[in-house]
Design a protein with these regions (language model features):
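Short amphipathic recognition helices of helix-turn-helix/homeodomain-type DNA-binding modules
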Residues: 56-64
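Short basic helix-loop element that most often maps to the first helix and adjoining turn
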Residues: 2-20, 45
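Recognition helix of helix-turn-helix/homeodomain-like DNA-binding domains
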Residues: 23-38
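DNA major-groove recognition helix of helix-turn-helix/homeodomain DNA-binding modules
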Residues: 41-56
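Conserved hydrophobic/aromatic packing and binding residues within compact polymer-binding modules
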Residues: 3, 17-18, 28-31, 57
């Protein structure tokens, strides 16, 4: 699954994820588009939010 698919499967809009993590909606969008890497400090929070392991989350990140 992609980051976007994980987010949608968890039932969140980008704005909701951004608010829960304390980042901008643009940051979440850029993560999903592979424009920016997710900072390590958000890995655990985002994985928990999406109901996956950190390893599964990292596996969805585009390789640039």
């Amino acid at each position: 699954m992609t980051l976007k698919e994980l987010r949608l499967a968890a039932g969140f809009q980008q704005a909701e994820v951004a608010k829960k993590l304390g980042v901008t909606t643009t940051a979440v969008s850029n993560w999903e588009l592979g424009k920016n890497a997710i900072l390590r400090k958000y890995h655990k929070k985002l994985a928990k939010l999406y109901g996956v392991t950190v390893e599964e989350l990292i596996g969805t990140m585009p390789q640039g």
